[in-house]
Structures are given as C-alpha cells and as structure tokens.
Amino acid sequence: MMNRIHAVILDWAGTTVDFGSFAPTQIFVEAFRQAFDVEITLAEARVPMGLGKWQHIEALGKLPAVDARWQAKFSRSMSAADIDAIYAAFMPLQIAKVVDFSSPIAGVIDTIAALRAEGIKIGSCSGYPRAVMERLVPAAAGHGYCPDHWVATDDLAAGGRPGPWMALQNVIALGIDAVAHCVKVDDAAPGISEGLNAGMWTVGLAVSGNEFGATWDAYQTMSKEDVAVRREHAASKLYAAGAHYVVDSLADLPEVIAHINARLAQGERL
C-alpha cells in the first residue's frame, strides 16, 4: 500500500468553503476604496488570487489599469507604505466578514469522509493570514469541515505561495514520508504552483473557485453554454499553471485520486 496517495493538501476559499471565492474579492474592493478612495473591479481583485494578501495587494497595484488609476490620482505608482495602508484596512474587514463565507461547498463533507475512509490525511493552507484563519477555521468546523492541519500564509518565515512552504509544512505536521504521495488541490494558479514546487500531484478546481467566479446561486441558474465558457476559461488557466488534473469541484477528487493511485501502482512517478 506504499504506492498510493497518503494526504491531500486543500486550499480554503473557492476549494472547500466560499463557492466562487467571494469573501476576499469583495473585501479587496472595499479596502482600496476605504484607504485611498480608489476603485478597483471584482474582476481585477480576482487576478492575483491565491497569493498572500499583502502580496495580492502589491500585485493589484501593478495591474496596468489599476496603476493608471493610481497614477492619475497620486502622480506616482503604489508604494510599500500604500500597500501597508490598504492591508491595514483589509484585515479588520476580512476578519469581520470571513465567518459569513465559512460554509463548506457542496460535496466537501462527503468527499472528506470518503478520503478519510481510505486512510488519506487532510491538510490545508490558505492565502489568508493567521488572524483571519483563526476566525474561519472554527466557523467552518461548526459547519462540519475540520481538516487535520492548517497553515496560514504568514505562519512561515520563508513565505507563502507560489513557494512550496505551506504545503511542505503540512507534510511535516501530518507525518507523510513522501511528497510524491500527496495531492495539492486549489482553485487558483499560485496554489497549483505551490503544489508543483513541493513535488506533489496537483488538481485544479475549475467551477467552485476564483477563476469561474460565480456564486452558487448564479451557477445553479446559469445556462449550459455559459457554464461551458466559464469552465473552459478557468481550466485553461489551471492547466497553464501546470495542473496534472482539472475537475469542477472537490466532489470530483476521489475519482482523480483513484486514477493517480492506479498510475502509482504501475510504477509511474512525478
């Protein structure tokens, strides 16, 4: 039984909770407005998703359209002090709101139970800092989702995504003896890069998360054509990031793991 998957490391928003990853995107828009009266769109707020939140704000400031707006208002580009100010506005807003987005995505609870029945451990990590995770984790547990371990983006001196460190910290905490027997699951490109950099199998989620960018209710009423277009857009970004597999949501993960286990049993290696 050595040649099989022993652990999955799951992202949070858009992967296990918060269908469409709306908690952080809305708060970025509000933080820019509150700190500097600068408008950004939800679509712009989604572009760097998966990074740590300070790095996310930094990346937003470098988007050509956002930089142009900033230059028009302040006659200069965004500085580190500006990023600090937006982050300072972001944090209390996110801490206050994250519990409203803590319900598990459809299929998550059953999938976790199925994985655990196979002896697979459940790790997790997030682009959220610890202060946010300390609110989100117990709220999600109240809804029935409780991974075996979690790591926040500001926990490790080495940093967060797209580096491998949060994923590897899960490997250490869970006592997994081979990174190639782990699967990193994420709905955004930096999380796929994280898994690849850690030497893991990677699975992208094309519908439940940031790249698809729809609420659960909107998804339920969406035409098949619209779903197909959005799915293809999201899948192409995740495959471009290097994902080994792309599926709709975490509910599809057990089938993927069965496929990976078959490949491992035949001697295939990453």
From Swiss-Prot:
UniProt GO molecular function: magnesium ion binding; phosphoglycolate phosphatase activity; phosphonoacetaldehyde hydrolase activity
Keyword line: Hydrolase, Magnesium, Metal-binding, Schiff base
The enzyme's E.C. designation: 3.11.1.1
GO CC terms of this entry: cytosol
Enzyme class: hydrolase
Biological processes annotated in GO: DNA repair; organic phosphonate catabolic process
SUPFAM superfamilies assigned: HAD-like
Cofactor note (record): Binds 1 Mg(2+) ion per subunit.
Active-site residue numbers: D11 (nucleophile), K53 (schiff-base intermediate with substrate)
Heme is among the record's keywords: no
This protein's record includes keyword Metal-binding: yes
Binding-site residues for Mg(2+), renumbered to this chain: D11, A13, D187
Family membership: Belongs to the HAD-like hydrolase superfamily. PhnX family.
Self-association state and partner proteins as the record states: Homodimer.
Job of this protein: Involved in phosphonate degradation.
Name listed for the protein in its UniProt record: Phosphonoacetaldehyde hydrolase
